[in-house]
């Protein structure tokens, strides 16, 4: 058989059919292969090996099918072929900051859910109603359902959680007085509504004056020599802080119908500066006949001088297991220390001389020379009357307040005698928790005095506002603010005086943005409410109320209490004192 060549085999194949599967004719357009498509489809790659991994952000089978399945189907590609490829990828570029940052403690600020249980108490006042408290003057006070902490935390919305928040102490404070079962809550008003009240500040008039004053020692105004500061001395002097209803002069003025409302400057200043307060406090209100007395309990928190109450990082109470060093800087310990400093600083900064003292119209009404063994402290009591009447009032509404001044000084220009209010700020430890970012007084007081004073105005807003209010009520000519620091930051036993700064009371109030009109509006509103509650009562009936600042929220609550409330406690305390005296004598 003759051999067959490959060319012959190829030539023998049928010419009408090609090798392979049959070619359909429905995808040909004028002899050119054509694939149907929609202009709305995105053009993609046949196979994209540079796309993100399927394991990233996988959230279950449904998310996987939705995000990754059939990504490379024709017309469904997510990567555009026409993206401009950047030469250098800057998505991972970051700036490295080598500066050291300070960590701010944020526990306890604005936690809206922490005190939710307390928020359920109250009625219309909490929801923004106008149940009793009204604005004095034009306009109506509108309350809201959001309570903002005056230190900056947002009390209703809370804050973002941070690292180890579970291990940080909660800023839960105890009330100044426990609410008893037989008390009835009448009103609840938040500070945002109190801040809207306003009454034109009245000009007071002097009714009478008691006591005497020593001259202020001007040497304290000079900058002390380094390492030669004056130590604060504990002086034994007879000083009195009698409440309103126990003041014999106020009782005489009430019998003469000289006014309708009676108070002392320390009680009235707390009420007028209430929107700045953070800690809990309480005021007892006694309504007898047509007279209203703003009173205080024995050993009330109003008598204590707080420290860094308005600081963002305020001092905290510690547990029983804490060390001695931590217990020195608790709010209660610092308040006792500051009260001791203020009492002794006012006594130390005067020149005690019987020949040069300035006497008032009457002697000290609380001093009994036959019973007291200690010499009398320099103190002047001025009883002043303020007119809080409005044009629509049928009868005038006057308030008598007992004010205090601490020293006297001659004006270097005119030679006139100026009455002074002497107070002291105290530093415990600028590096300890609760210091509020205060500067070191020993090194910065005289070189950066403005910064030191500004920090104190921020951290002790309520304290300085009360002092300025008391000085304005007393019509004092100037204020002396002393700066007293611990001799050893780890001990509260010894203190040194670093310097004294002078202010005019109204200038200090202006620097702190203190609105006295708002304070008078608060007082007038509470007086109106008390009178309205007892409008249908018998004239001789004695009714008693307690006004309490909530310890954890910017809210005031008014309670109706039995007439003998706190009197039993005073009698029990007197009996304990008598027993202790008898045991000591035996």
Curated annotation (Swiss-Prot):
Pfam families membership = eIF-3_zeta
Please give the residue ranges the record annotates as the region Disordered: 16-37, 104-176, 563-586
Annotated region RNA gate: where? 301-315
GO annotations of cellular component type? cytosol; eukaryotic 43S preinitiation complex; eukaryotic 48S preinitiation complex; eukaryotic translation initiation factor 3 complex, eIF3e; eukaryotic translation initiation factor 3 complex, eIF3m
The subunit field of the Swiss-Prot or TrEMBL record says: Component of the eukaryotic translation initiation factor 3 (eIF-3) complex.
Family affiliation: Belongs to the eIF-3 subunit D family.
Q: What is this protein called?
A: Eukaryotic translation initiation factor 3 subunit D
Could you tell me where the Acidic residues compositional bias lies?
A: 566-577
Q: Which InterPro entries match?
A: eIF3d
> Quick check: keyword Protein biosynthesis in the entry?
yes
Q: Which GO terms describe its biological process?
A: cap-dependent translational initiation; formation of cytoplasmic translation initiation complex
The annotated regions of Gly residues compositional bias extend over: 108-131
Alphabetized UniProt keyword annotations: Cytoplasm, Initiation factor, Protein biosynthesis, RNA-binding
Compositional bias (Basic and acidic residues):
162-174
- Give GO MF terms, alphabetically: mRNA cap binding; translation initiation factor activity
**What's this chain's function?**
mRNA cap-binding component of the eukaryotic translation initiation factor 3 (eIF-3) complex, which is involved in protein synthesis of a specialized repertoire of mRNAs and, together with other initiation factors, stimulates binding of mRNA and methionyl-tRNAi to the 40S ribosome. The eIF-3 complex specifically targets and initiates translation of a subset of mRNAs involved in cell proliferation. In the eIF-3 complex, eif3d specifically recognizes and binds the 7-methylguanosine cap of a subset of mRNAs.
Q: What is known of its domains?
A: The RNA gate region regulates mRNA cap recognition to prevent promiscuous mRNA-binding before assembly of eif3d into the full eukaryotic translation initiation factor 3 (eIF-3) complex.
Cellular location of this protein? Cytoplasm
